[in-house]
Design a protein with these regions (language model features):
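Membrane-proximal intracellular helices of multi-pass ion channels
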Residues: 1-456
């Protein structure tokens, strides 16, 4: 008995010592994986489903992944398949995924009065894409306060409409759930009671619901670092960091330009006044959230392809959104502009972009487009479906958006597993997973000579 106890203690110490040797990237990946598996285990239980039956593991895992990775693709209608307990579990998973596993664990550490060590600060900075370690504890507190405060305000603003339609207590719950889902850019809804997988189509012309959801999505998608910059510098725009200026300018452009295109190219059967609301909502939700107020499958292929491009771009660094990020798009555009103007280096807001950032932006674009195309081709082969719906589904999963033409519930198990992997990659980050599998930075003792190669 004593020997068995000693062996177990030795195993425990080996596990603890192994965790101490993990780098920040590995801890982030394992943290998300642990929460996902825990959520899947709970969602499998009969208490989580509305009819009291066991949920197949793949469906429970898919739901847990889409919640933690704040995607929104679902294989079961969230509003009708899951019980109230299941809805609460999904909401907690969304909140955990939106804030980040590291941010939540760090918040509990701060509340307990314990000191945050240097290694913990490094992990915290990496998880929210902070440029430096100084002030990371203050930033974490700011993130939690802003998140909970904005979600509460959003819930209170939507409460009158949902309480009118669903009664007081259920209406308050619906308001809270959709506020958290919108701010975290999850796009998961409970409105299946009005039609399976109907999302927000029953509120397509409701100004209050549309505008509140739009604001929540935008606030969550801009990024905590940007809001911290705005909070500290207020109206002194000249003091903003270059990254904040890039995010704000490109976010505005990516909201209004697609909205204008949607208004003139799509939804022609809707009156002009209501079409403005639908076009604006679809422009905002396409890049990050996954809610929809219109039938996407009835759109033209040009409109569908525009949505694919918007999903690929996604939100901003340090936010709850996925995609290659607005800053990556900005760097790529500035690189092209520099080449056209025959400049030595790309520039934005009177600042030069360092070569390492340019190389990273190119690598991210190559990785996301390659993975998206590979996933789309695989889904098309496995499911015998046209390429456009499969490409839409693939980019939606990889960019953690959650929009779909309605094919997700009909997919086979292999296709569901592929989307699970892609949602995980999209939320954690492709580069994070790559760095997590590498032993460390390789120091080059020497460099090869340079030589030019013809391109273009």
């Amino acid at each position: 008995m004593e020997q068995m106890l000693c062996e177990r203690i030795q195993i425990m110490f080996r596990i603890l010592s192994a965790f101490r040797r993990l780098n920040s990237f590995q801890i982030i990946v394992l943290g998300f994986a642990f929460v996902i598996l825990l959520g899947a285990g709970i969602l499998m239980l009969p208490v989580s489903s509305a009819d009291g039956s066991w949920t197949p593991f793949v469906n429970a895992l898919f739901t847990s992944v889409t919640s933690v990775c704040v995607t929104g693709l679902v294989v079961c209608d969230t509003g009708t398949y899951w019980s109230s307990f299941g809805h609460a579990v999904i909401l907690l998973l969304i909140q955990t995924g939106g804030l980040g596993v590291v941010t939540i664990s760090a918040s509990f550490t701060i509340l307990s009065g314990k000191k945050i060590g240097l290694s913990q600060r490094s992990i915290m900075a990496e998880s929210v894409a902070a440029p430096q370690l100084s002030g990371i504890v203050r930033l974490t507190g700011f993130i939690v306060r802003v998140t909970l405060g904005v979600e509460l305000i959003g819930a209170l603003l939507m409460a009158p409409v949902f309480c009118r339609d669903f009664g007081l207590f259920r209406g308050l719950w619906m308001s809270l759930f959709h506020s958290v889902s919108a701010f975290c850019n999850a796009g998961i809804d409970l409105l299946g009671v009005r039609g399976a997988y109907s999302s927000l189509t029953s509120y397509a012309y409701d100004p209050l619901i549309n505008l509140v959801i739009i604001l929540l999505i935008v606030i969550g998608g801009i990024g905590f670092l940007t809001w911290d910059d705005i909070y500290r510098n207020r109206h002194h725009i000249s003091r903003y960091r270059m990254q904040s200026k890039v995010i704000l300018s490109y976010s505005l452009a990516l909201i209004f330009i697609p909205a204008i295109l949607f208004f003139f190219l799509e939804f022609q059967d809707i009156p002009a006044g209501k079409r403005i609301l639908v076009s604006l909502f679809q422009s905002v939700t396409t890049r990050t959230a996954g809610f929809n107020t219109a039938d996407l499958s009835s759109m033209r292929e040009s409109g569908q392809f525009l949505m694919i491009l918007l999903m690929l771009v996604g939100g901003s660094p340090g936010s709850t959104a996925g995609g290659i990020k607005t800053t990556t798009l900005a760097v790529l555009i500035s690189c092209a502009t520099a080449v056209f103007a025959r400049k030595d280096s790309p520039e934005m807001f009177k600042r030069r972009i360092v070569p390492d950032i340019v190389a990273t932006a190119i690598a991210i674009l190559f990785m996301y487009t390659s993975l998206g195309i590979l996933c789309a081709m695989t889904l098309s082969i496995l499911e015998s479906l046209p390429l456009i719906p499969c490409l839409f589904e693939a980019i939606s999963a990889l960019a953690t958006v959650g929009l779909s033409f309605g094919i997700t519930p009909t997919l086979s198990v292999p296709s569901k597993l592929i989307l699970i992997a892609f949602m995980f990659i999209g939320r954690v980050g492709g580069l994070t997973i790559i760095y997590a599998t590498m032993s460390g930075y390789k120091i080059q003792c020497g460099k090869f000579p340079q030589e030019k190669i013809s391109v273009g």
